Amino acid sequence: LDEAEAEWHTAIARLQELPLADTDILIQEAYRAGKRILAEGAQGTMLDIDFGTYPFVTSSTTTAAGACTGLGLAPNRIGEVIGIFKAYCTRVGSGPFPTELDDELGEKIRQIGREFGSTTGRPRRTGWLDLVALKYAVEVNGVTQLMRMKADVLSGLDSLEVCTSYRYRGEEVDHLPYRLDAQLLEPVYQSLPGWSEDLTGVRKTTDLPDT
């Protein structure tokens, strides 16, 4: 206990050494000086307090608009919005997940992709890529560049499924319904060929498999 308490006091002392500043002033000064400013968001669009799958959301703004409210930066000063998405979908905790894989394949993706909460260690739910939700995220955030990650996790699968639309109340829709009721929502999939190559060390798009 004494050792843990000593470590705690050491950590507090380190925090007290850090300089305090009005970050909005620093940001404005950097902007006026023509410096490049990079803001990184945490959590996904579907957890946003306003545009997420309420009530299964977080308590803050997780969209690109959060850069404005969090930094004190005016919306018209944002240049590029880079959207980052996984080659498959994940979610922690409760909430709608139309493409969820609650089976051995889902567990395989979880283990290979190390899909566990960074703080709590809770297993993340996994599923096929949902292009309907991705399209929604692109529109809400005003994404100008889109980057995919973790495609290497899916190496070795004979085929992949990608959700391109939903069947909702007897109709096929290509947008997120107002109410994401799992009982009423059925994903429509398109099958794509998989690949066997190991993509771990790939750095160029020309080295990716033809799929």
Where are these regions (language model features)?
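Non-transmembrane, aqueous-exposed alpha-helical and coiled segments at domain scale
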Residues: 1-211
